[in-house]
From Swiss-Prot:
Keyword terms: Ribonucleoprotein, Ribosomal protein, RNA-binding, rRNA-binding
One Gene Ontology MF term: structural constituent of ribosome
A Pfam family that the UniProt record links to this protein: Ribosomal_L20
SUPFAM superfamilies in the cross-refs: Ribosomal protein L20
ATP-binding recorded as keyword: no
UniProt function note: Binds directly to 23S ribosomal RNA and is necessary for the in vitro assembly process of the 50S ribosomal subunit. It is not involved in the protein synthesizing functions of that subunit.
Protein name: Large ribosomal subunit protein bL20
Lineage: Bacteria, Bacillati, Mycoplasmatota, Mycoplasmoidales, Metamycoplasmataceae
Organism: Mycoplasmopsis fermentans (Mycoplasma fermentans)
Length: 116
């Protein structure tokens, strides 16, 4: 007896269309285009999980740089001074301090300047 794969095929296509729900135009309706769109979205998601880490680090460095230049010191000299003074605060915390607690950040700048 011949077995047709209708139920299996329908289930497989339904799975891909469910993943493409909310996509614009034919990407949410057509099976082939929907599958391609979902696979592409997974590619972007994988790439951007790595990129977001770089983007945030760039943001923190820009914030620290702006705060240190306001005090008359460059970012690189500030970070070098902190390393010489054995101050181990990561860039995320430094940027938060620069925004929320400028007095504490000014003390860190003084420590970095005095480090030899």
């Amino acid at each position: 007896m011949r077995v047709k794969g209708g139920t299996v095929t329908r289930a497989r296509r339904k799975k891909w269309l469910k993943l493409a729900k909310g996509y614009f135009g034919h990407k949410s309706i057509g099976y082939k285009v929907a599958k391609q769109a979902v696979v592409k979205s997974w590619t972007y998601a994988f790439r951007d999980r790595k990129q977001i880490k770089r983007e945030f680090r760039k943001l923190w460095i820009a914030r620290i740089n702006a705060a240190t230049r306001a005090e008359g010191l460059s970012y690189s000299k500030f970070i070098n001074g902190l390393k010489r003074a054995n101050v181990t605060i990561n860039r995320k915390m430094l940027s938060e301090l620069a925004i929320s607690e400028p007095k504490t950040f000014a003390m860190l700048i003084k420590i970095a300047r005095d480090a030899k």
